[in-house]
Amino acid sequence: MRLSQLSHPNELHGLAISELEDVACQIRERHLQVVSTSGGHLGPGLGVVELTIALYQTLDLDVDKVIWDVGHQAYPHKLLTGRYNRFDSLRQQKGVAGYLKRTESKFDHFGAGHASTSISAALGMAIARDRKGEDYKCVAVIGDGALTGGMALEAINHAGHLPKTPLLVVLNDNDMSISPPVGALSTYLNRMRHSPPVQFISDSVQESVKNLPFMGDAIQEEFKSLTGSVRRLAVPSVGAVFEELGFTYMGPVDGHDIAELTRTFNAAHKVGGPVMVHVATTKGKGYPYAEADQVGYHAQSSFDLTTGKSIPSKTPKPPSFSKVFGQTLVKLCEQDSKIVGITAAMAEGTALNLLQKAIPDQYVDVGIAEQHAVTLAGGMACEGIKPVVAIYSTFLQRAYDQLIHDIGIQNLPVTFVLDRAGIVGADGPTHQGQYDISYLRCIPNFTVMAPKDESELQQMLVTCINHNGPSALRIPRGSGEGAALMEEGWESLEIGKAETLEEGENLLIIGYGSMVFPAIRTAAILKEFGVNSTVINARFIRPLDEDTIHEAAKRIGKVVTMEEGTLLGGFGSAVVESFNDNDIFVPTLRIGIPDKLVDHATPQQSKESLGLTPEMMADQIRNKFNFN
């Protein structure tokens, strides 16, 4: 069968193992061809090709529901569910999304982008199914890294308490998340991975017992108990945790053997109640470079398929904000042993891998456990440690209660560095960092700031670490502005003090963080129309520099705020609220992300669609204030 001609995943039914293996080769070929050209997640999807094929040929996907955790490993799922011919548009504007979206396909039953949600969603569907008296299978596919997340463990705890609710959890164990997973549970899974497989006593034996004259039915329950005891005695450690939590455990199964996977899934479907099938896979399977470097090939920009090397940018770029942060933190840690960097399974993305390599004693990876990371940092701060929690803006949302309850209310000196703040591009709405300005500015005792460039980032990092209270700074994805960097001798900024960059009498433009340089470029465009602007780098949103901003607003009389975040409760709202509270009534234009989701596209395309380019912002300003 040609994969390009597959119109429905149910067409896998009845194919011979050799034919299914050929489909697997075609999936890998298409997967590699597209990702090498346009970029995307590589290793996760390559590792679940056989798992996906085997699972889908045991299901009726017109009715059965499969929930993929995170979604970055679901490229084979997309190729099997009608998106083969559009797959060239992967992660491109108006193309196939890099994650799962309910609006994209009827086979995407639950959207995702963050980890550890699949078991909860699948269990919810299973409970709804049973309440409605319907009959279909609910399956969650979750990676071993995501299983360290508290939400996944909460769902397992609940599901195990529902012995009459059929639910299949497929544990895709590739011994990795993005980087190697950490923690006792990961160690346990690794030990299980190398243990002999545990399967069921065959259906025929159970049927024979049931058919014994006079007593077959009577000893059915005792037989089930005996079966479990025999399995535990045979291999006492394998699956014991899941069995004790109420799951029937099967595995570990070779995740690249379609025949064995098919037999196991068929057996699992016959069990009533929650079942855990443990599948051992290899991340990056089938592409030697990805198998050899599973961290580096988790996700890739465009690369040469023959050599495995990334295709370099045509124009050299300054270091990224993330890299500057990581390098600066290493230097600060060298000077102060009390500083500790904390990540939640995102060492490479946040550049804390630099600290991990340089000073491992001052580095902590808690796994996919953002809530724990925040409160862990709070506990450290209580004892005189200076924790720096580096985390994506979108992932810090998962620990909002901890920010308020454990850090803010207690006024604990913890530094939060929010990476990927603002528009992130091809990862789409689940990963846009558009909400942190709003959700941080209302938390008691927090000081919140954003640098205009990488040099100011260095100063703000020192400011946060030296501050005797909770603080947060946001940095955008991508390269910096090329500002000169200092190797040492950084000084703290005055908290709550803005910076006036340009003086003009016709318009006041206040930029926050990554929008400061676009504000300067917008002012230059307006100058061509005779509009002279004062441009202020706000630096801080909490506390806001009311003295500087109020004086300029009253003097000039026309105000524009610019931010790379949602307008609802954002930086512009903070400025307008401050004006209102102080009886300053001046016309104000707030520019930022409107009340809408930002879909996957390049960052530049997203900014164009939102009206956030200097040219488009200049047009908005001219229309608002009648600058002709």
Swiss-Prot record:
GO terms for molecular function: 1-deoxy-D-xylulose-5-phosphate synthase activity; magnesium ion binding; thiamine pyrophosphate binding. Mg(2+) binds at residues 144, 174. The keyword Transferase applies. InterPro entries: Dxylulose-5-P_synthase, THDP-binding, Transketo_C/PFOR_II, Transketolase-like_Pyr-bd, Transketolase_BS, Transketolase_C, Transketolase_CS. One of its GO terms (cellular component) is cytosol. Keywords: Isoprene biosynthesis, Magnesium, Metal-binding, Thiamine biosynthesis, Thiamine pyrophosphate, Transferase. It comes from the Bacteria. NCBIfam families: dxs, PRK05444.2-2. HAMAP family: DXP_synth. Catalyzes the acyloin condensation reaction between C atoms 2 and 3 of pyruvate and glyceraldehyde 3-phosphate to yield 1-deoxy-D-xylulose-5-phosphate (DXP). This is 1-deoxy-D-xylulose-5-phosphate synthase.
